[in-house]
């Protein structure tokens, strides 16, 4: 499962890339989505790699984002009680584990919003014009996406 965070804004973005970001539901900066590892998603990520940060997410990071930033329709917080009452999962942690193992989808919890609005990163980004390999924040972070998600908790 991939965590994808939009890092750059809408100015001077080509129409095709803006459409791709719209299909990924990344309409605003600091928004995050979690995507399954499919060829379609990989292609959209590759196309918009100059405007997003992405990487493979682990269970702990996903649990933290779901519990702190997960919202239901009506802007109510996602809680363990809601997950237990309205889905087959016992808690947010078990739901996150099932998501990482591709045994579940975000839509398995009813009314859960698929976009997570993150806080701007504490101490700022390393640079939004350079890739992660060049010392910036754009592109593929691999397993190190958890550090970015922790900064934006």
From Swiss-Prot:
GO cellular component: cytosolic large ribosomal subunit
Subunit structure: Part of the 50S ribosomal subunit.
NCBIfam families attached to this UniProt entry: PRK06049.1 (NF004711), uL30_arch (TIGR01309)
CDD domains xrefs: Ribosomal_L7_archeal_euk
GO process annotations (BP): maturation of LSU-rRNA from tricistronic rRNA transcript (SSU-rRNA, 5.8S rRNA, LSU-rRNA); translation
Family as reported in the entry's similarity comment: Belongs to the universal ribosomal protein uL30 family.
InterPro entries, per the entry: Ribo_uL30_ferredoxin-like_sf (IPR036919), Ribosomal_uL30 (IPR039699), Ribosomal_uL30_arc (IPR005997), Ribosomal_uL30_euk_arc (IPR035808), Ribosomal_uL30_ferredoxin-like (IPR016082)
Single Gene Ontology MF annotation: RNA binding
Name of protein: Large ribosomal subunit protein uL30
UniProt KW keywords: Ribonucleoprotein, Ribosomal protein
Gene3D superfamilies to which the protein is assigned, alphabetical: 1.10.15.30, Ribosomal protein L30, ferredoxin-like fold domain (3.30.1390.20)
């Amino acid at each position: 499962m991939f965590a994808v965070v939009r890092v750059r804004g809408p100015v001077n973005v080509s129409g095709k890339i803006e459409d791709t970001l719209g299909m990924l539901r990344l309409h605003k900066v600091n928004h995050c989505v979690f995507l399954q590892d499919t060829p379609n998603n990989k292609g959209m990520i590759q196309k918009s790699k100059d405007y997003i940060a992405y990487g493979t997410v682990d269970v702990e990071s996903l649990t933290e984002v779901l519990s702190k930033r997960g919202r239901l329709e009506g802007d109510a917080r996602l809680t363990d009680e809601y997950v237990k009452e309205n889905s087959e999962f016992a808690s947010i942690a078990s739901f996150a584990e099932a998501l990482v193992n591709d045994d579940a989808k975000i839509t398995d919890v009813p009314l859960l919003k698929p976009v997570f609005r993150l806080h701007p990163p504490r101490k700022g980004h390393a640079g939004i014009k350079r890739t992660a390999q060049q010392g910036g924040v754009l592109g593929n972070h691999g397993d190190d996406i958890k550090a970015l998600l922790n900064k934006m908790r």
